[in-house]
């Protein structure tokens, strides 16, 4: 397992390829309760760029604006319990579309969360089929939804290796955490925060730093299901 800096849930990645497939789609306003306004007021470009590594490669998403706008919840069944989160499709359409693509292609099945932090920051990092912290899906895409981003307990956000290097790795925040707004938030846990806190209470092997390592209670994904809301 690669050594990671303790202050941020980053992942190590190799260089990216330069070919880009981009799609421009309407970005919708949301009300205070998260309901999308019908009138598009801006556009957002979803660019999924072929990249290495390509672990458990499932292809590269072809952005579908209609599908991306559909609200959904993701239910992640793990060996430690079930976690459900509501995807922020209006605020992070490129990220939520990518996550849905990977989930619907069984990308996460039988993978496990490889990093738990219990000091300074409080996250459980998942989404790498190699379980090393250096794996990726074979493509990357830019950051979004960072303006004013905060990371309270229950946040689901992307891990990265620097600006605009998102892939498949993501993290759950199991306790309110202060991070710079550099990690795309794309969901909120609606059930299973207790599962995350149980895993956190089990501690880690601290192989990276004290309170930062491989979780002792390893959550392996049995499956990840997408449900329309």
Show the residue positions of the predicted features.
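Cyclophilin-like peptidyl-prolyl cis-trans isomerases
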Residues: 2-229
